[in-house]
Amino acid sequence: MTMRVALLVFAGCDLLDLGGPYEVLLTANRLAERRGQPAPFEVVTVGLDTQPVRAYGGLGLLAEQRVDEVGELDVVVVPGLVDVAAGTRDGPLIAAVRRLVTAAGLAASVCTGAFLLAEAGALRGLAATTHHEDLPELRARDDVGEVVGGRRWVDAGAVVTGAGLSSGLDLGLHLVDRLAGRELASATATQIEHPWDPDGRHEAS
């Protein structure tokens, strides 16, 4: 069964946070199809609207669909941003995150995307992680369960959170592992030439 995965695009989002899991999922699809198997993921980018926005650094991005027209999802991936305070105060953005989390069976974030999930109420009572520099700030919130350092990702069941930036690759591989199997995840890690630890260990804490 093909699983529908939406990646949220918004002004100021980090490119590596977005592109890491996006590339992993597309690569997993390509490897599956090469073996004569159906692609496990339907990957779509979604935004508050379908007008161009600029990611952090200025690169233009264009979402394929609006959040309000997405329908049911299996997974939503929320990237992070540099200006976390501005992101958590952005009412329309948080409303979009909340809507996507409600529509999806599984929510995921990369880096400071965890703060957007928290602001949307998705991390209450759940373990989570984020960029190592932002762990104290995430711990200071009262709407997050245990905040875990020293991990590339933390799987809390309904929500998976990734650490900083390049951890989006590891989070993407974990999603492939969890949803499509260890063998495809390992093959995907080899294809993208990324050293992957299926246990999500990380030297930074």
Please tell me what each predicted stretch does:
Residues M1-A107, L117-E119, P136, V148-G150, ...:
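Extended, subdomain-level signal for the structured scaffold at the beginning of enzyme domains
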Residues V9, T130, A163:
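Small/polar loops that bind or transfer phosphate-bearing groups
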Residues A107-A108, T129, V148, V160:
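Structural detector of well-ordered beta-strand residues that form the stable sheet scaffold
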Residues A122-A140:
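Short, glycine-/small-residue-rich phosphate/pyrophosphate-handling segment
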Residues R141-E146:
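A structural motif
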Residues V147-A163:
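Amphipathic alpha-helical segments enriched in hydrophobic/aromatic residues interleaved with Lys/Arg
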Residues G164-G168:
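Short acidic alpha-helix initiation/capping motifs at coil-to-helix transition points
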